[in-house]
Amino acid sequence: MKMKYFHHPSGLLPRLLLLLLLTMGAVACTKEDNPDQPTSDEVATVKMSLDDVEMRGGDLYSGEDLIKKVRIFVFREGLNGLWVLDKQKLFASGQSDFQNPFTISAHAGPRQIYVIANEPDALTTKLDKILFKKELEDMQAPDVNEPIVRPFTMTGMATATLNPQGTVQANISLNRIAAKITLDIKQVTPGSDVIKITKVQILRNAKNSRLLEGTNKPTGYWNWANACDLPLTNNGSAQSIIQASAPLYVYENIGSDSDSSGRATQLVVEALYNGIKTRYYAYVNDKTTTANHHYSIRRNHHYKLDGTITKMGEFSSLLLTTTVLPWTVENLDYGFLVPYVAEINPHAVITQDNVVTFENSLSFTVRIKGRDGSRWKATLDNGLEFGFDSGSAIDGAADGTTVYTIKVKALKPNGIGIQRRTNLFFTVDGKKVILDKNINPQPTDIKIIQQGL
């Protein structure tokens, strides 16, 4: 007799049956193997706090990056060490529960928790169908043939033991899937040599990457090129080719010294040296750096390239220094500037609760300093009950010299027994402005209240 098989059109049926068997096995073994653990058929709640994520004007940000979606996976260990899905949930901007920390309920017991922020739209359907941790670990981010653009996908992981007797708190640090590259070049040559940069390339940027951080090598590459007409000044200041305000964002490219010749990311500079065409080559993050991952690029890091042309030639005539920094580290020598208030009047608005009413606004003047050419923006974190009064500046040049007047008012009449609060802060390039560098901890928010009647 010929056997008949039922084929589910989604291909999920065999995986669902396997998941059911593994889950039943995990439940049966829980008390026998771990008598002190809460039973896994009990429901518990965990609050996931995303580090360095804050609400600004009703939106969630991690540093300068806007977060629009957060997906949480909770996995439990099944038979033979296979981690299976216990619960997953997608949080989206605009929903009432889209706030940090995020709350999710799952079954009690030891759990591994993964967070995906700003998931690519192309992966949403695949992520919806995840049943095993291995599927998530193997998932590839979308292929690219050009720089990665914001909003960046971010991922993080934590472990926690969920207990039905109380809400468990867990913290997760998010890592961006991208790395960033900046490049400055200067000339230090004998005599009166004249050099003009005509083209710069960053070769062998990874075309693909795992969604989660891993050790896999790229299977394809793309090249970045920028034609330019940039004269250098001998023994003068460096010229920014890839500026700090507009870095090159790429996937991680992980490997080793042994495979560097066909895989490692490479810098190529084309120039006219006293009118003669020449070309310079150098590996990004080679053995001369102090990093622990030579010839590789890792996600959530900043690769600051400083090149010095010393003479005509190819490899040895371009001295390239790669400084590897965490994404959020500021380097003041490189022109990164933590924005700050150059002057605020009256200064007391920084240190006190500033009272406003429906009729009378808070008014003060401010000068803000950021990097050259940058602009500041003012934000109230309670825009439903407070706003900027007429004549108030809400953005401006962060040049440190222009004086702006800020006016904040209450949008509603004073209520009986109702106290309303908001924080006012300024940002430059997504970074909060420090109000006074001499106060520890350095303040960034101005507190404003409306008293109740």
From Swiss-Prot:
GO terms for molecular function: host cell extracellular matrix binding. A lipid is attached at C29 (N-palmitoyl cysteine). GO terms for biological process: cell-cell adhesion. One of its GO terms (cellular component) is cell outer membrane. Disruption phenotype: Triple mutants lacking FimC, FimD and FimE show strongly decreased interaction with host CXCR4 and impaired down-regulation of the TLR2-mediated innate immune response, resulting in strongly reduced survival of the bacteria. It is found in: Fimbrium; Cell outer membrane. A lipid is attached at C29 (S-diacylglycerol cysteine). Residues 29-56 form a propeptide. Keywords: Cell outer membrane, Fimbrium, Lipoprotein, Membrane, Palmitate, Signal, Virulence. The keyword Signal applies. Residues 1-28 form the signal peptide. The keyword Membrane applies. Pfam families: P_gingi_FimA. Minor component of fimbriae. These long, filamentous pili are attached to the cell surface; they mediate biofilm formation, adhesion onto host cells and onto other bacteria that are part of the oral microbiome. They play an important role in invasion of periodontal tissues and are major virulence factors. FimC, FimD and FimE contribute to interaction with host CXCR4 and thereby down-regulate the TLR2-mediated host immune response. Belongs to the bacteroidetes fimbrillin superfamily. FimA/Mfa1 family. The name (major fimbrium subunit) does not indicate the abundance of the protein, but is derived from the greater length of the major fimbriae. In strain ATCC 33277 and strain ATCC BAA-1703 / FDC 381, major fimbriae are 300 - 1600 nM in length and about 5 nm in diameter. In contrast, minor fimbriae are only about 80 - 120 nm long. This length difference is observed only in a small number of strains, including strain ATCC 33277 and strain ATCC BAA-1703 / FDC 381, and is due to a loss of function mutation in FimB, a protein that restricts fimbrial length in other strains. Fimbriae are composed of a major, structural subunit and the minor components FimC, FimD and FimE. Identified in a complex composed of FimC, FimD and FimE (in vitro). The complex interacts with host extracellular matrix proteins, including fibronectin and type I collagen. Interacts with host CXCR4. This is Major fimbrium subunit FimC. It comes from Porphyromonas gingivalis (strain ATCC 33277 / DSM 20709 / CIP 103683 / JCM 12257 / NCTC 11834 / 2561). The gene is fimC.
